[in-house]
Amino acid sequence: MAHGIPSQGKVTITVDEYSSNPTQAFTHYNINQSRFQPPHVHMVDPIPYDTPKPAGHTRFVCISDTHSRTDGIQMPYGDILLHTGDFTELGLPSEVKKFNDWLGNLPYEYKIVIAGNHELTFDKEFMADLVKQDYYRFPSVSKLKPEDFDNVQSLLTNSIYLQDSEVTVKGFRIYGAPWTPWFNGWGFNLPRGQSLLDKWNLIPEGTDILMTHGPPLGFRDWVPKELQRVGCVELLNTVQRRVRPKLHVFGGIHEGYGTMTDGYTTYINASTCTVSFQPTNPPIIFDLPNPQGS
């Protein structure tokens, strides 16, 4: 496949033959297509916080998976904050309010947020099925009354919340989606394959910055303990073959913190918490040239 060049014409993504086995998919495409090989695909060193922002650029500050552990995070200078989900433990309204208060004290011009699998109350279908599924698994969430969480997103008064939706700020077209492959029945979990692809098909071409909670296949998605890749194949194909954003920010896999590129799109796993839920991974900054006319 071509690297460094936006896709031309209408591209239709279909379910990948290796969709259900991302580790096998990675091996297959690496061997047969060199899809994850240098020089195009490589790690990107973090930008030091004291690096001057280039003229005519916007600085993005990327974080994810803070899990109600924001008190000790040292936030760097920037223009736009991107948080790609799991800002709470369970999505309890009290947690959301605390997070919103923290956002309110940050100086960024725009703060854009999506949900993750831990924001249970943001997933209406999940909440509707919670009692039927396993009442005792999330007792503090199960005890909530519908009026407590029906409009929980409205508590995020200090940010722009995206859920299968987009916003344009400072000329950048930004799209956010919370969905991840099924994992132990948390919020916004969907089966691999067509169910997730249907969500990725909603991402418009022309998106500059994509925010998802989980990673695409092959980019910061390795789980050492399981010796497995866990990224979504359909998300990778959507990003590389159809949407071609300049920046794809995500989290979800705490072990995958860091930045990579495929020669065109920059991929940032901004997970703040480590695998042991310690909020020690620093925010990642990234500068993009301002769109023409912005």
UniProtKB/Swiss-Prot annotation:
Q: Highest taxon of the source?
A: Eukaryota
Q: Where does Mn(2+) 1 bind?
A: D65, H67, D86, H254
The record lists Mn(2+) 2 as bound by D86, N117, H213
Q: Does the keyword Protease apply?
A: no
Q: How is its activity regulated?
A: Inhibited by nmolar levels of AMP and GMP.
| Cofactor requirement | Mn(2+); Co(2+)
The UniProt record gives the binding positions of GMP as: N117, H118, K225, E226, H254, E255
Q: Where, by tissue, is this protein expressed?
A: Expressed in fetal brain (at protein level). detected in fetal and adult brain.
Q: What are the UniProt keywords, alphabetically? A: Cobalt, Hydrolase, Manganese, Metal-binding, Nucleotide-binding
Task: State the disulfide connectivity.
Answer: none
Q: Which InterPro entries match?
A: Calcineurin-like_Pesterase (IPR024201), Calcineurin-like_PHP_ApaH (IPR004843), Metallo-depent_PP-like (IPR029052), UPF0046_metallophosphoest (IPR051693)
Summarize the impact of D86A.
Answer: Loss of phosphodiesterase activity
Q: List its EC numbers.
A: 3.1.-.-
- What subunit structure does UniProt give? Homodimer.
Belongs to which family? Belongs to the UPF0046 family.
**What other facts are recorded?**
This protein has a low affinity for cofactor and demonstrates very restricted substrate specificity. The enzyme may need additional interacting proteins to show full activity, or may be losing its activity and acquiring the role of a scaffolding protein.
Q: What does this protein do?
A: Displays low metallophosphoesterase activity (in vitro). May play a role in the development of the nervous system.
What name does the UniProt record give this protein? Answer: Metallophosphoesterase MPPED2
> What species is this protein from?
Rattus norvegicus
Q: Which gene encodes it?
A: Mpped2
